[in-house]
Amino acid sequence: MAIRVQVESFDAGAEVNAMHAANVGVGAVVSFVGYVRDFNEGREVSGMFLEHYPGMTEKALAKIAVEAEQRWPLLKLEVLHRIGALEPGEPIVFVAAASAHRQAAFDACAFVMDYLKTRAPFWKKENTSEGARWVEGRDSDHAAADRWK
């Protein structure tokens, strides 16, 4: 398992290739990359600032990853989340799960993203055409996480 919280951008393709190269038993790698949108809830977004609680955020992500590893036969799991100032089009989050078979990788990747959105202490502040605003969690994120209970 690899957990990273960082300011720097990342190359999702290189991350996936590294996961596969590290283990010849990998039959499937499923990944998700989230990007900063230029539009949200009817407002133009010119940028975003992501804050986190150092130490606590990494522990929360590790707890989610451990639960995924207990639920599915994974060979590798990576969670990478950016913080700081971001512009539309930039990657925010990368989650990838590697397994011998695709279904475990699909399920684990979805589980980690659903739990990350509801259980990891990140705060998003969007700069919009109407000023800056903190982004609230969505009911749909909680509903998605509830399916794993």
Mark where each language-model region is.
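N-terminal, polar/charged subdomain of small-to-medium soluble alpha/beta proteins
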Residues: 1-92, 106-110, 114-149
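Short glycine-rich or small-residue beta-strand-to-loop segments that form or flank ligand, phosphate
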Residues: 92-99
